[in-house]
Amino acid sequence: MYRISPIGRKSNFHSREKCLIGLVLVTLCFLCFGGIFLLPDNFGSDRVLRVYKHFRKAGPEIFIPAPPLAAHAPHRSEDPHFIGDRQRLEQKIRAELGDMLDEPPAAGGGEPGQFQVLAQQAQAPAPVAALADQPLDQDEGHAAIPVLAAPVQGDNAASQASSHPQSSAQQHNQQQPQLPLGGGGNDQAPDTLDATLEERRQKVKEMMEHAWHNYKLYAWGKNELRPLSQRPHSASIFGSYDLGATIVDGLDTLYIMGLEKEYREGRDWIERKFSLDNISAELSVFETNIRFVGGMLTLYAFTGDPLYKEKAQHVADKLLPAFQTPTGIPYALVNTKTGVAKNYGWASGGSSILSEFGTLHLEFAYLSDITGNPLYRERVQTIRQVLKEIEKPKGLYPNFLNPKTGKWGQLHMSLGALGDSYYEYLLKAWLQSGQTDEEAREMFDEAMLAILDKMVRTSPGGLTYVSDLKFDRLEHKMDHLACFSGGLFALGAATRQNDYTDKYMEVGKGITNTCHESYIRAPTQLGPEAFRFSEAVEARALRSQEKYYILRPETFESYFVLWRLTHDQKYRDWGWEAVLALEKHCRTAHGYCGLRNVYQQEPQKDDVQQSFFLAETLKYLYLLFSDDSVLPLDEWVFNTEAHPLPIKGANAYYRQAPVTLPVSNAS
Ligand code: DMJ
């Protein structure tokens, strides 16, 4: 029996039509939903990977659209996942840098301003002796590895303070130890002081004054300065509010340099203006923690001024709603008014980012110790436990973790962007605890051994570098951000004598050397954002979007750490080369700018003076030319924004408070 169609025609034609529609629907479904199985997150099984490779040969653009920026189009043969990842990274960088990368170059770079070298500040001796005198093995051209010993527990001012509960105001009034403004000085008598060294130190101090004074003139209370246009700048990480990022980030550097007047101006602004109350800012949990909480904590350790403890706690409290996830892994962004938190849309299916949620431990642990409130430490311990217990592919930590499911996102690993400071905080949490947090040291060693095995490589030209790893494929590229790891490996070597000590030190020196090479292979003598290793090039950027330099500190951080640990003069020489390059290319009449292309003889400037230039770049350079007794590495551990935090049990400035027990336990 024939069914009659609505228009009264026989349905044999209708069946053919149905077939055709069915076919079209199946094809559409395949095109729409087939991609789900081919997304990078689902690369867990070989079968899917094989299918993906098969289709990739046929034309990857079917599933993964080509990058939109034609001008930045990578080489056609490149793995499309690398393209996707780079796009996401670019988005993150854009979010950090605001519109700076897109801006038309401003007219006129400005000439270096006249600078006035201040008379040397009176230098009080540092409170505790420097890194123990270590014998230098000069014959072999390098120092024997010194070991920064664990402090003797209980034998320190911090433990004495903790046994005498006081209010913060009482503590401050009763003259708790205060680091001398000027941060301590050179141990040598002035007449035996190396004149050149002192000149270099003073030069860096003058750079800080130049950066600060222009920020004050044109952007006071705003987040950052645009030196060319002489107006404020704010990256989206600061939530579009005037949070005085440069003040909070740069203040401990002023203190260390003994710039008292400037320091007092900054303190005054924080007291009168800094607050996150009654604003609805969407802040980056990570950036707010490392710059604002970290900066305030250091200032509290230096001075004992309760203002800084209160502000640190105030900021940390605003971040706490971000931790309310099924796993306790925090979201990346939080609204300071509503407490609504979320992740970046681009981060592997709603994942949190390893380098962000893994870089809270130092600040939150210290905040608990100085406030007596265990809550902050509990929050970061939860993150630690998740990361300890989760299965690590080949012993490595992927960059993305879903805070709802507790499962890894894309299997991309990096010691540069998206991964970097997680590894840093494992070692430093152990150091900060006075080498008692053994769990952290074990996790650090396990992670670094896997990285040594799977990601550290040597180029044909003999340069040691850390590759990114993406689904078992090495991308022979290193971010400038990963240049901090030279210092990290060296610090790992210097603090524990074991089977890996020599390897860590060798790799630490090798990476630092490679980062230096990336600088001196550019005509500006400043290093690019990322550099590659191929048959054609070594330690050079290849793509236009990785040729910029935004006043980053990581290479100088490694010079500083390696100098302290080896006393090899070359690290100071390299630091001075960098100072000259910064002065030649980045200095303007109204502050310091990054460069758009380090390979040009006369590169355009980017018109942003990053807050980390004052917090990190200038601080590390200043310390490089300072005596070891200024912030000795066996008493201070630097957070990832170069804010030094005291080491428990070794440092009189730890200022531990008595633990405040919950009411139910108090009786
Ligand atoms: C800083 O904000 C911190 O060092 C962070 O860990 C990553 N890099 C920037 C400066 O380059």
Curated annotation (Swiss-Prot):
Localization, UniProt: Golgi apparatus membrane
Protein residues bound to Ca(2+): T640
Disulfide cysteine pairs (residue numbers): C483-C515
Membrane topology label: Single-pass type II membrane protein
Tissue-specific expression: Complex spatial distribution during embryogenesis, including expression in lobula plate giant neurons. Also expressed in adult wing and eyes.
Stored InterPro entries: 6hp_glycosidase-like_sf (IPR012341), Glyco_hydro_47 (IPR001382), Glycosyl_Hydrolase_47 (IPR050749), Seven-hairpin_glycosidases (IPR036026)
Cytoplasmic side: 1-18
Annotated pathway: Protein modification; protein glycosylation
Keywords recorded for this protein, A-Z: Calcium, Disulfide bond, Glycoprotein, Glycosidase, Golgi apparatus, Hydrolase, Membrane, Metal-binding, Signal-anchor, Transmembrane, Transmembrane helix
A molecular function GO annotation: mannosyl-oligosaccharide 1,2-alpha-mannosidase activity
Region (Disordered): 154-192
Topological domains, Lumenal: 40-667
Stretches with biased composition (Low complexity): 156-178
Function: Involved in the maturation of Asn-linked oligosaccharides. Progressively trim alpha-1,2-linked mannose residues from Man(9)GlcNAc(2) to produce Man(5)GlcNAc(2).
Matches recorded under PANTHER family: MANNOSYL-OLIGOSACCHARIDE ALPHA-1,2-MANNOSIDASE IA-RELATED (PTHR11742:SF6), MANNOSYL-OLIGOSACCHARIDE ALPHA-1,2-MANNOSIDASE-RELATED (PTHR11742)
Protein name: Mannosyl-oligosaccharide alpha-1,2-mannosidase IA
Source organism: Drosophila melanogaster
Lineage: Eukaryota, Metazoa, Ecdysozoa, Arthropoda, Hexapoda
Annotated gene: alpha-Man-Ia
